[in-house]
Amino acid sequence: GAVPCGKDGRQCRNHADCCNCCPFGTCAPSTNRILPGCSTGMFLTR
């Protein structure tokens, strides 16, 4: 299921610890230094 995350609280279909949402709705862990909360890969929900 989608989970709210990011500053705007939009829904993300994929979840990661401390996730934020990108314009494309993908999530990334907060440890991403280059693009915080952004990733081209998807993190599947456990």
Curated annotation (Swiss-Prot):
Belongs to the conotoxin I1 superfamily. Iota-conotoxins bind to voltage-gated sodium channels (Nav) and act as agonists by shifting the voltage-dependence of activation to more hyperpolarized levels. Produces general excitatory symptoms. The keyword Flavoprotein does not apply. GO terms for molecular function: sodium channel regulator activity; toxin activity. Residues 46 form a propeptide. The modification D-leucine is found at residue 44. GO terms for cellular component: extracellular region. It comes from Conus radiatus. This is Iota-conotoxin-like R11.18. Keywords: D-amino acid, Disulfide bond, Ion channel impairing toxin, Neurotoxin, Secreted, Toxin, Voltage-gated sodium channel impairing toxin. PROSITE patterns: I_CONOTOXIN (PS60019). The lineage of its organism: Eukaryota, Metazoa, Spiralia, Lophotrochozoa, Mollusca. The cysteine framework is XI (C-C-CC-CC-C-C).
